[in-house]
């Protein structure tokens, strides 16, 4: 049962976002046209998909695990409510790679946003187990 519908529109030659399984968190996004990715280069690949993210939600463009295994990095993208342009996906490849029109290149996950306001305060006075430990601080 669907609780909310998100309106989308496709440019000519674009592929409809799909889910392989109804329980999947994200919709697969597809390359609209063939693209040659050069080694150690970063490219913006157009999907030709427009979505109308409602107020109180955000669209996250996330990597596909199969691309990560192929040495293709996809940084997270954010689609704010009100943006109506075509979704593009940033891809970086370790080696030369051809992406064909119709290849799945990322996934779109739409999530609700809590209403939060940022207030200034003394963060360092807050004691926690983690503290200032960041990258690699857990020893793994």
Predicted regions and their residues:
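DUTPase catalytic domain/fold
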Residues: 1-140
């Amino acid at each position: 049962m669907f609780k909310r519908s998100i309106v989308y529109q496709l440019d000519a030659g674009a592929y409809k976002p799909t889910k392989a399984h109804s329980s999947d968190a994200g919709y697969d996004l597809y390359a609209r046209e063939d693209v040659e990715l050069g080694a150690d280069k970063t490219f913006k690949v157009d999907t030709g998909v427009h979505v109308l993210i409602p107020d109180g939600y955000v669209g996250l463009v996330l990597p596909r695990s199969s691309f990560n295994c192929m040495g293709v990095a996809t940084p997270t993208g954010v689609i704010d409510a009100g943006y109506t342009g075509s979704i593009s996906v940033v891809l970086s490849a370790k080696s030369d790679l051809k992406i064909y029109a119709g290849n799945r290149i990322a996934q779109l996950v739409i999530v609700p946003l809590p209403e939060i306001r940022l207030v200034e305060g003394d963060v360092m006075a807050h004691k926690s187990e983690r503290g200032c430990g960041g990258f690699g601080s857990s020893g793994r």
